[in-house]
A protein has these predicted regions:
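Conserved glycine-rich cofactor-binding loop
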Residues: 11-13
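Conserved glycine-rich Rossmann-like NAD(P)H-binding loop of the short-chain dehydrogenase/reductase
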Residues: 26-41
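Short, small/polar-rich loop/turn modules that mediate ligand/substrate recognition or access, typified
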Residues: 84, 168, 173, 230-232
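Substrate-binding pocket helix/loop in short-chain dehydrogenase/reductase
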Residues: 94-95, 99-107, 200
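Active-site helix of classical SDR
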Residues: 118, 152, 160
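Alpha-helical segment proximal to the catalytic Tyr-Lys
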Residues: 123, 165-169, 228
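Residue(s) in the substrate-gating loop at a strand-loop-helix junction
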Residues: 136
């Protein structure tokens, strides 16, 4: 019988790539997203491949969304085997520039919604089911800016670890991937910045930049029966960025420019050991 995966943020970026990989490997997809136009891409892809798909245009932070998403899977396919919590948002702001509304937005979308979706999916799961949470390398190591983002993604790793321990004895696995920065609608503005792009390249030992397809391969592997003895793990998909203290030869010999007076890129005035404000 065909396995069924529920994917959030399925209309673009990593979510669309994950959905494509599932369909290509004969896994039916229930795609969730806010934008019907983006979900239409997934529907067109499924039609092209001749594979089954169901979509639901809904904000996953809404109270009724988790139950509606799981109900759609059961109604259309009679089962649910995998949940991929992928929906996310990015913001390049450090903690002292992040207001409560932004903090709530990030925690609601990238921690509370995955928690509630997992809770609903677990009620429908049987042995052999799995959850794959899409976290970030910035949940593993510190980085500049993105305070709310890092906090939410790190919380997602904590949730992953708990669920692996709690539900492993029922044959339900929970794992996470931690992607580096790959080109998506959410990250394109950062990758267009020459300084960020060079920093990312100089700190990555692999010989190329990552893609959404790289992340999709990892997600779909962890969701598959082939990963049946993998539980509670975080797989960094970043070309070695997070685990190796690496600088390219060009960066090693580069001269560090002096910092100009005033605020630095870290958000603190040079020489100021007090609180930013």
């Amino acid at each position: 019988m065909m396995r069924v995966a529920l994917v959030t943020g399925a209309g673009s970026g990593i979510g669309l790539a994950v959905s494509r990989k599932f369909l290509q490997t004969d896994v039916a997809v229930v795609g969730i997203g806010r934008d019907p136009a983006k979900l239409a891409r997934l529907e067109a892809l499924a039609a092209e491949l001749g594979k089954p798909v169901a979509t639901l245009a809904v904000d996953v932070t809404q109270d009724a969304a988790p139950a509606a998403a799981v109900a759609l899977a059961i109604e259309r396919f009679g089962r649910l085997d995998c949940l991929v919590n992928n929906a996310g948002v990015g913001s390049p702001k450090p903690v002292h520039e992040t207001d409560d509304a932004t903090l709530d937005q990030f925690l609601d979308l990238m921690l509370r919604a995955p928690f509630r979706l997992a809770r609903e999916a677990l009620r429908a799961f049987g042995p052999g089911s799995s959850i794959v949470n899409v976290a970030s390398t910035y949940a593993l190591v510190g980085g500049l800016r993105g305070g709310a983002y890092s906090a939410a993604k790190a919380g997602l790793l904590g949730l992953t670890s708990h669920m692996a321990a709690q539900y492993g004895s029922a044959g339900i696995r929970s794992n996470a991937v931690a992607p580096g920065v790959v080109p998506t609608d959410m990250t394109i503005h950062r990758l267009q910045d020459q300084g960020f792009r060079r920093m990312n390249d100089d700190m990555t030992p692999s010989d190329r930049r990552g893609t959404v397809e790289d992340v999709a391969e990892a997600v779909c592997f962890l969701a598959s029966p082939a990963a049946g003895w993998i539980n509670g793990q975080v797989l960094a998909v970043d070309g070695g960025w997070s685990s190796i203290k690496f600088l390219s030869e060009e960066a090693l010999v580069a001269e560090r420019l002096p910092v100009q007076p005033g605020w630095t890129h870290s958000g603190r005035a040079r020489g100021d050991r007090g609180q930013p404000g």
